[in-house]
């Protein structure tokens, strides 16, 4: 009840008090891990999730939690070691499939990333996160019919998705497919989310390819003034 009322600190306090370290109850341990993850307290989440993995190895949530913690620790390889050996048990579990696909993507294993994110999307067809990452994978692997289809779907289902507009624009300009459409998409992205360094950089790159060099320089300079560390701009 306290968790539902967003009184997470008191919920944790009560659960810790009733938790018996010598006889851990599954529901209490799972709830504690969930609360610590919600608080982004990954240290304590790990402590209780280790109990979950050790005492309840058949419970799926322990491996999923471990993968979440690993990804937040910038360790996709570790996340893969938790999920891959058990993935046959999670064939209908969106979270497990999505996390495994995301881990492979962060590890630059695009083939496996595509496989598991595609499975995740079959389980949960409305997953925008899966669509975004799959679109980037298709783009990087030259499967542009698939990437274009996903970008258009993302835009159609949410006209405020600046990332979809920008990534579609960048994809188009990189392959010089349709610069006018790329410009239209990029302008919309920048209208939705002004002062975004990567979005301004995309717009400048499009104007460069359209040989409108003054405009190109203007937007690249704006982008650089916001984020001078972007290696693409530098």
Role assignments for model-derived ranges:
Residues 21-22, 54-56, 88-90, 123-124, ...:
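Structural marker of alpha-solenoid helical repeat scaffolds
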Residues 4, 38, 72-73, 106, ...:
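Register position in tetratricopeptide repeats
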Residues 1, 34, 68, 102, ...:
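Residue-level recognition of tetratricopeptide repeat
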């Amino acid at each position: 009840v306290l968790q539902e009322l967003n009184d997470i600190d008191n919920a944790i306090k009560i659960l810790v008090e009733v938790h018996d370290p010598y006889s851990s109850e599954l529901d209490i341990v799972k709830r504690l891990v969930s609360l610590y993850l919600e608080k982004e307290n990954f240290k304590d989440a790990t402590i209780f999730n280790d109990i979950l993995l050790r005492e309840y190895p058949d419970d799926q949530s322990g491996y999923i939690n471990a993968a979440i913690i690993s990804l937040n620790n910038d360790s996709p390889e570790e996340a893969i070691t938790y999920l891959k050996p058990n993935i046959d048990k999670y064939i209908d579990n969106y979270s497990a499939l999505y996390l495994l696909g995301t881990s492979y993507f962060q590890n630059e294993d695009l083939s496996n990333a595509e496989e598991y994110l595609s499975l995740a999307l079959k389980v949960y067809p409305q997953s925008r996160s899966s669509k975004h990452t799959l679109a980037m994978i298709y783009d990087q692997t030259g499967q542009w019919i698939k990437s274009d289809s996903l970008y258009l779907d993302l835009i159609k289902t949410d006209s405020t998705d600046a990332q979809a507009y920008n990534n579609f624009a960048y994809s188009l300009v990189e392959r010089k497919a349709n610069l006018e459409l790329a410009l239209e998409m990029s302008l919309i992205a920048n209208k939705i989310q002004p002062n975004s360094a990567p979005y301004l950089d995309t717009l400048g790159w499009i104007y460069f390819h359209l040989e409108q060099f003054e405009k190109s320089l203007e937007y690249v300079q704006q982008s650089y003034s916001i984020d001078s560390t972007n290696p693409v701009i530098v």
